[in-house]
Amino acid sequence: VSGQTFEHQNEDGTWNELFARGVNIGSSLPGKWFTEFVRSEQLFIDWFEKISAMGANTIRVYTLLAPEFYSALQYYNASCAEQPLLLYQEIWPEENPIDGDYLAPEYEEEYKQEIRHVIDAMHGRAVIPERDFRAYGLYTSDISPYIAGYLVGRELEPEEVIRTDERNPG
């Protein structure tokens, strides 16, 4: 951030002002559960072509997606794009902490592990074991040059905040 604008560092180390025109991409196809991750590189490449054609230059994803998404983004940006698509990568915490306490040490450690998984995946250095309701697999595509930013957290419901506050007075 410079003044009131975003800047993005190019691969050669120079900085350009970035006016983000973006698109959100979910984890699944319409009509599927959000935990049924898309695993087609070609489908993502097709989407990236359409996203670029409509004038967008950034993509936001709500959570770590399947490895195929990042492979497709690396391929598209390196091979197809006149201008690369940049990524806002959200790091989604577990939704149901034990006893509803977002400040519990176990919950905090789980979230820190998720942050490590996501950052390692963005650098193409992650092997994430199979897990329920989350993306997993071998992440070998280094898309770190295309990261516009990390979005840490998610919206919390008022009831969740109240429960956490009740368990952590002061």
PLM region descriptions:
Residues 60, 78, 82-170:
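Active-site region of glycoside hydrolase catalytic domains
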Residues 1-78:
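Active-site-adjacent substrate/metal-binding segments within catalytic domains
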